[in-house]
Amino acid sequence: MNTLKNNAEILDSFRENPDMMAILTIIRDLELKDSWLAAGSVRNFIWNLLSDNPAFDCDTDEDVIFFDPDVSYEETLALENKLREDFPQYQWELKNQVYMHQHSPHTEPYRNSCDAMSKYPERCTAVGLRLHANATLELFAPYGLEDILNFQVRPTPHFLENEDRMKLYQKRLSKKNWQEKWKNLTFKNT
């Protein structure tokens, strides 16, 4: 089994993968405000790498997030469709985080993309990566990377503090079937 020891090794793994760098470049070149490759796109890449599977999985959605109050829901869908047309080799999911709080019970509007990621259901999903114009990579992981590196799935503090959100968390986990692909996952409700 592969091991990653620190953030630099993780970033190097992304940098060395042609598909991930192509995706990150596409996202950067869209010039959307506060944009990131996030959630399962980043988490699954690391889990695959640690499991000695091909790191890039063409079946994984490319979760692109951004935060722009001036871009409507309809415009976001149009941008997502354009991505799918222009780069059909990837499974694009484009979400403006301005609107996404509506999918999480009793949640205030997010302030920015990092605020949104910090309130994702699982700590291992609360992660984002972006490529800057100077070619540096930035990794955002508000709860650290330990849960990802240890194949641990547990709720974020935001989900833990509300019973309705915890029900959504449980429902989500029951649909994901992650353990079929990554056998050594452990699940916790705390």
Sequence positions of predicted segments:
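Catalytic cores of the polymerase beta-like nucleotidyltransferase superfamily
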Residues: 1-190
